[in-house]
């Protein structure tokens, strides 16, 4: 007997657990109705009358998809046998149900009649069940159809009636009698009737021998030993030895690989090319060869240079053809062409041809093949200079078809930068004499300060450079004297204000001026001596008053010596060398 409780997702309580019953003492006391006493659907009907059909409120109609684990009424996917036995039910409800009448018969429908109405409604919508009668062919067990003895063969004619409605009874399939094979009748027949045929002992022994041979010849599969759950946890020594075996197997594999590398990789180490890691484009541009090819070429070149002479075509003159020897320690460059590299290539590759033309000017009928440059065998292909040519915009232009002085690309001297667009030439700048004249006339309307300079500009142009330099020096001398005298006068005025009584009113201004003058590096000890001399000359402070008043009232009049220096300053630009060039870092508006 195997108990197989299977859950079904149903709301009518007609599943496989509906007929599961526990025998009770109270039920055993009433032996008049054994089926009704063992069937407790009346308790369920009473419970359904009290509470609505909801998964939260009912334990019996709980859906298996319920996730409300906090509610005590929900089964939450687990089996709940509450209110099925009489142990957990209310005795008041039980007594009330027991007093109700029980309808016994084949009719499963109970009709509920409302007060004062003759209309009868069925108490349930469950279909009418036709009980299946088991055929009794076998006197002992019978002959079931599907190999299992089902409890549905036993008809149940009891239905519980309450005041509201009735839930129909279902078949009890919780307990099933299951045999090992599907065909139960054949097994029962084999058990009931023993075999009458006796087999030969010799045939049995031969079959046993053949089966033993067959089992020894075939490869046996790895059998999985069924262990208990305690051993399957792999705890303790079993887990330790399993890990140890995996670790040892991994270390053995690593040791095997290392041993294979050690034994069978000596060839790669022996024929290693070089330890230098250079990129592929550098190797290509520098004429890279493998070690084997390099050694073969070196040996062949050595034997070739010792034994035989190079083969020359018949039409080529060997005497006049120069032999270009390439040194082995040439710094190899990249193959990218720049304008300077093109110029160098054009000048270097044709140097031998220029010597030929200078030596033999009379030999006019020589072919162009004589102008080829011969070279000794070398390790790198880039050193083997063939016909002199240059590459301009991915086109090879041979230089041998032109004369030495008539190349298709004109060679320019790199030192000559007269036509360079990035150099500003000061000679091309135009003087702004008209604008200067308008500015000076607007500034000095009644005063003719620059008349001498403007009038004498034409006469100064005809002077020599030595006279111009002398005039420039005089102009700078007079300018510096005027500036220094003005600064000395300022120092004297500051000293006068410091000595006066109104010292506090001008204190901040005078301190700022004094700090600026003291921090200035222009005034040296000579300035201090001149200041002392001038202080000794000025006896009374009234002279400073007259000096300051005159300087405030009258405009600044340039002395005659300063006017003469301005005339020399007008031609100061012409005294500087005319070929001075300026960088782009200087502002454009400033002319030197």
Swiss-Prot record:
Cellular component GO terms held in the UniProt record: cellular bud neck
Superkingdom in the source lineage: Eukaryota
Cell compartments where the protein resides: Bud neck
Coiled coil: none
Family (UniProt): Belongs to the AIM44 family.
Biased composition, class Low complexity, residue ranges: 213-222
Organism of this sequence: Kluyveromyces lactis (strain ATCC 8585 / CBS 2359 / DSM 70799 / NBRC 1267 / NRRL Y-1140 / WM37) (Yeast)
Biased composition (Polar residues): 193-204, 528-537
Protein name stated in the entry: Altered inheritance of mitochondria protein 44
Residue ranges of the region described as Disordered: 186-223, 528-553
UniProt main location, coarse: other
């Amino acid at each position: 007997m195997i108990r197989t409780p299977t859950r079904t997702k149903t709301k009518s309580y007609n599943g496989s657990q509906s007929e599961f019953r526990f025998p009770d003492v109270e039920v055993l006391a009433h032996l008049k109705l054994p089926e009704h006493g063992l069937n407790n659907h009346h308790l369920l009907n009473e419970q359904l009358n009290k509470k609505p059909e909801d998964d939260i409120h009912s334990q019996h109609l709980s859906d298996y998809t319920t996730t409300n684990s906090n509610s005590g009424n929900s089964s939450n996917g687990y089996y709940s046998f509450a209110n099925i036995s009489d142990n957990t039910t209310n005795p008041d409800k039980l007594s009330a149900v027991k007093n109700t009448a029980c309808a016994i018969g084949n009719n499963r429908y109970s009709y509920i009649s409302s007060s004062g109405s003759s209309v009868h409604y069925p108490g349930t919508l469950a279909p009418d069940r036709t009980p299946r009668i088991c055929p009794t062919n076998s006197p002992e067990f019978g002959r079931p159809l599907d190999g299992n003895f089902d409890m549905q063969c036993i008809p149940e004619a009891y239905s519980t009636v309450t005041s509201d409605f009735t839930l129909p009874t279902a078949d009890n399939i919780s307990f099933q009698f299951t045999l090992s094979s599907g065909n139960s009748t054949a097994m029962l027949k084999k058990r009931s009737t023993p075999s009458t045929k006796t087999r030969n002992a010799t045939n049995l022994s031969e079959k046993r021998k053949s089966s033993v041979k067959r089992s020894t010849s075939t490869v046996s599969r790895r059998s999985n030993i069924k262990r208990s759950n305690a051993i399957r946890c792999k705890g303790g020594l079993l887990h330790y030895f399993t890990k140890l075996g995996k670790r040892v197997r991994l270390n053995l594999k690593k040791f095997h690989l290392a041993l294979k590398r050690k034994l069978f990789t000596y060839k790669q180490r022996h024929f290693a090319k070089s330890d230098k890691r250079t990129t592929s484009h550098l190797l290509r541009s520098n004429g890279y060869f493998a070690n084997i090819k390099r050694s073969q070429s070196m040996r062949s070149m050595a034997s070739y240079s010792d034994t035989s002479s190079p083969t020359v075509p018949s039409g080529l003159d060997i005497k006049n053809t120069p032999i270009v020897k390439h040194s082995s320690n040439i710094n190899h460059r990249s193959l990218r062409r720049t304008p300077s590299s093109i110029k160098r290539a054009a000048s270097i590759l044709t140097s031998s041809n220029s010597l030929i033309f200078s030596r033999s000017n009379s030999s006019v009928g020589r072919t162009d093949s004589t102008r080829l440059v011969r070279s000794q065998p070398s390790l790198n292909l880039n050193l083997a200079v063939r016909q002199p040519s240059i590459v301009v915009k991915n086109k090879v232009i041979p230089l041998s078809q032109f004369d030495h002085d008539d190349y298709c690309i004109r060679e320019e001297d790199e030192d000559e930068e007269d036509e360079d667009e990035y150099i500003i030439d000061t000679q091309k700048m135009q003087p702004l004499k008209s604008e200067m004249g308008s500015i000076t006339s607007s500034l000095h309307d009644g005063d003719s300060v620059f008349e001498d300079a403007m009038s004498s500009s034409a006469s100064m142009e005809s002077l020599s450079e030595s006279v111009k330099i002398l005039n420039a020096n005089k102009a700078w001398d007079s300018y510096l004297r005027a500036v220094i005298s003005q600064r000395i006068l300022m120092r004297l005025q500051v000293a006068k204000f410091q000595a006066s009584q109104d010292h506090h009113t001008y204190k901040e201004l005078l301190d700022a001026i004094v700090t600026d003058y003291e921090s200035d590096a222009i005034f040296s000890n000579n300035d201090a001596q001149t200041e002392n001399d001038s202080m000794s000359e000025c006896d009374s402070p009234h002279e400073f008053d007259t000096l300051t008043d005159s300087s405030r009232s009258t405009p600044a009049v340039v002395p005659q010596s300063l006017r003469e220096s301005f005339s020399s300053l007008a031609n100061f630009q012409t005294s500087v060398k005319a070929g001075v060039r300026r960088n782009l870092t200087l502002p454009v508006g400033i002319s030197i």
